[in-house]
């Protein structure tokens, strides 16, 4: 099939979004920003009303054959059944979904289509690789998909123009489109999304045994690692169950690595070898703008928790004329202050440190 990145298709509306939680409502807001006619439907009418009230579209009120695109953003467990229902109700529409597991949906959909004699060629699976630990239409954001990957999973029975409509949907939301087979997609998300989520949960679960005075020592590292463990459990149960084969394979590989690590703990040289393997894996993750990660040095500046302090600091960093590779903030639990870690090229760290001190900032050595 033709690479979807070679053309610039235009999305044809009206668009009906079925399921308006975080993802559905965010798609609605993004499309409304682009001037698309967006309609909303949710089994919980309150969700539709809230989303409509916050600019995600209007309540669906057109004839079934008027819609040209149906976006299914329901919980994973009901996606296949919902796709079948919408293919039947909307004969002129391309139907796509946003669920993070494609193979299981396609298998169930194929079974349902065979049982009911339904043509599923107008269904093109997709998956926007974006989200937060929050849920519901009140958390929606029109910028959620900007510069994020949106996987489109075409099949040989799809019409080219139908696939291009899903590509146009993703691009209208500001996303970067990647075309990928459904089963390859499921392995990929197990590696880069589902396994990391479970590692976050395992780390957070281990904290239940920690004493309160030990938890008081926690810094930004543990908060970063456990942040996604706060995500909604019902949705993640469905995601992990749907992709259980690929997730199990990843967990078994981690189990082997844990056994290897345990065998190395009393041997410093072998332990360092293992740590180096982790560094090599981290370097494979794309850095800024999708480029290879580069070596940086952190210049850590103390900032008071007062209005305007961060803006002044950013202005002074800009005045130094040094390119910033990354930023992170650590809060001081003992007093009303924080620390901004400014990652720059190692050759510029000393210059930035001197500039910050000249502007009156306290810099950690």
Residues of each region from the PLM?
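Interdomain hinge/lid region at the active-site interface
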Residues: 211-279, 296-299
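NAD(P)+-binding Rossmann beta1-loop-alpha1 motif at the extreme N-terminus of oxidoreductases
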Residues: 2-60, 69
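Internal alpha-helical scaffold of NAD(P)-dependent oxidoreductase catalytic cores
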Residues: 144-230
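N-terminal Rossmann-like NAD(P) cofactor-binding module of classical short-chain dehydrogenase/reductase
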Residues: 70-71, 96
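Active-site capping/gating segments
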Residues: 122-159
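Rossmann-like NAD(P)(H) cofactor-binding subdomain of soluble oxidoreductases
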Residues: 82-137
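A conserved regulatory-domain signal marking ACT and ACT-like small-molecule sensing domains
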Residues: 281-365
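Residues in the short beta-alpha loop(s) of Rossmann-like NAD(P)-binding domains
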Residues: 43-44, 99, 330
């Amino acid at each position: 099939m033709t690479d979807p990145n070679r053309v610039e298709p235009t999305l044809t509306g009206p668009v009906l979004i079925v399921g308006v939680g975080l993802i559905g409502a965010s798609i609605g807001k993004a499309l409304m920003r682009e001037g698309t006619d967006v309609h909303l439907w949710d089994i919980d009418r309150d969700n539709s009303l809230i989303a409509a009230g916050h600019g995600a579209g209007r309540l669906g009120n057109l004839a079934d054959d008027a819609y040209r695109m149906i976006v299914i953003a329901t919980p994973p467990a009901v996606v296949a059944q919902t796709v079948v229902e919408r293919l039947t109700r909307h004969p002129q529409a391309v139907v796509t979904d946003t669920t993070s597991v494609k193979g299981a949906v396609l298998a169930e959909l194929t079974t349902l289509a065979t049982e009911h004699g339904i043509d599923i060629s107008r269904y093109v699976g997709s998956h926007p690789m974006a989200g937060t630990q929050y849920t519901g239409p009140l958390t929606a954001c029109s910028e959620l998909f900007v510069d994020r990957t949106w996987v489109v999973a075409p099949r040989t029975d799809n019409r080219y123009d139908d696939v291009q409509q899903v590509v146009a949907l993703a691009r209208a939301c500001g996303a970067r489109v990647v075309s990928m087979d459904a089963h390859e997609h499921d392995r990929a998300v197990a590696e880069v999304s589902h396994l990391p989520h479970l590692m976050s949960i395992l780390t957070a679960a281990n904290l239940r045994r920690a004493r309160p005075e030990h938890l008081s020592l926690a810094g930004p590292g543990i908060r970063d690692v456990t942040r996604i463990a706060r995500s909604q459990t019902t949705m993640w149960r469905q995601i992990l169950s749907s992709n259980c084969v690929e997730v199990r394979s990843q967990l078994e590989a981690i189990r082997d690595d844990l056994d290897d690590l345990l065998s190395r703990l009393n041997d410093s040289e072998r332990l360092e070898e293992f740590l180096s393997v982790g560094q090599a894996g981290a370097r494979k993750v794309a850095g800024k703008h999708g480029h290879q990660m580069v070596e940086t040095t952190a210049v850590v500046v103390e900032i008071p928790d007062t209005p305007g302090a961060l803006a002044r600091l950013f202005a002074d960093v800009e005045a130094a004329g040094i390119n910033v590779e990354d930023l992170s903030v650590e809060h001081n639990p003992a007093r009303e202050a924080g620390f901004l870690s400014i990652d720059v090229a190692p050759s510029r760290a000393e210059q930035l440190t001197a500039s910050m001190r000249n502007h009156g900032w306290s810099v950690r050595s």
